[in-house]
């Protein structure tokens, strides 16, 4: 009986010690899933996405181990995976008939930028960041595929408790798309005009996310 109590006490002390140490460990890696909307702005018209989903994974490189004033840490975020898919629906009248055309956008980006991490109490953190996000963007219609390098910027804010965080971020940028595949010219973008993306496309969007930090 005494041995059992001793083992139980030892186990409780070990768990307590690990928990206390875990609170001081910097959580450097992050993975997040998000849902949002995107605006595709081409010339004088704008198309809003039905939805957009994203998966992001990366790491924070803290510039110092100890908190400044017992409250703030600064870091550099490096995101190795930033994958976004957005779906659009645009009603157009072609040959006197109304049709809903579907469009799909796929982006793969890398991110880098500064971040600020505030620890007001215990395991609660507030994170804010601004990242430069070079990407390759694909935009696909029924018969066309466009693609090119895109320049994005991402800024956001999240609140975490222990290893989980809820956040919101804005995403904006632009892309000069090139037609990289074409099966047939159809009037998807501008009725009665050749189907081309002949101006720089601006992207504006937002997303809410759940993030896991390790």
Give short role names for the model-derived ranges.
Residues 1-26, 213:
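Cleavable N-terminal export/targeting peptides
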Residues 20-69, 200-214:
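Short glycine/proline- and aromatic-enriched beta-strand/turn motifs that initiate or cap beta-hairpins
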Residues 27, 47-55, 68-70, 104-110, ...:
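Residues that define the transmembrane beta-barrel architecture of outer-membrane proteins
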Residues 35-41, 76-84, 132-140, 161-163, ...:
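Transmembrane beta-strands of outer-membrane beta-barrel pores
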Residues 40, 146-214:
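Predominantly the C-terminal beta-signal and adjacent terminal strand-loop region
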Residues 41-48, 84-94, 138-149, 178-187:
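Outer-membrane beta-barrel translocator domains and adjoining extracellular loop/strand segments
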Residues 62-67, 119-123, 161-164:
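Outer-membrane beta-barrel channels and translocator barrels
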């Amino acid at each position: 009986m005494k041995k059992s109590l001793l083992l139980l006490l030892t186990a409780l002390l070990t768990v307590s010690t690990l928990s206390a140490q875990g609170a001081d460990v910097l959580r450097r890696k992050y993975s997040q899933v998000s849902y949002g909307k995107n605006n595709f702005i081409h010339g004088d018209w704008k198309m809003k996405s039905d939805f957009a989903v994203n998966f992001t994974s990366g790491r924070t490189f803290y510039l110092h181990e100890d908190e400044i004033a017992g409250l703030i840490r600064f870091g550099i975020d490096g995101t190795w995976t930033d994958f976004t898919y957005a779906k659009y629906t645009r009603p157009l009248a072609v040959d006197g008939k109304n049709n809903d055309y579907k469009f799909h956008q796929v982006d793969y980006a890398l991110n880098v930028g500064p971040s600020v991490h505030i620890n007001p109490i215990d395991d609660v953190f507030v994170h804010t960041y601004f990242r430069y996000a070079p990407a390759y963007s694909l935009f696909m219609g029924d018969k066309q595929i466009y693609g090119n390098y895109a320049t994005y910027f991402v800024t956001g804010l999240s609140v975490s408790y222990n290893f989980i965080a809820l956040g919101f971020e804005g995403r904006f940028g632009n892309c000069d798309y090139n037609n990289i595949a074409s099966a047939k010219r159809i009037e998807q973008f501008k009725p009665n005009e050749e189907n081309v993306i002949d101006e720089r496309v601006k992207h504006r969007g937002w997303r809410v996310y759940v993030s896991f930090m390790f």
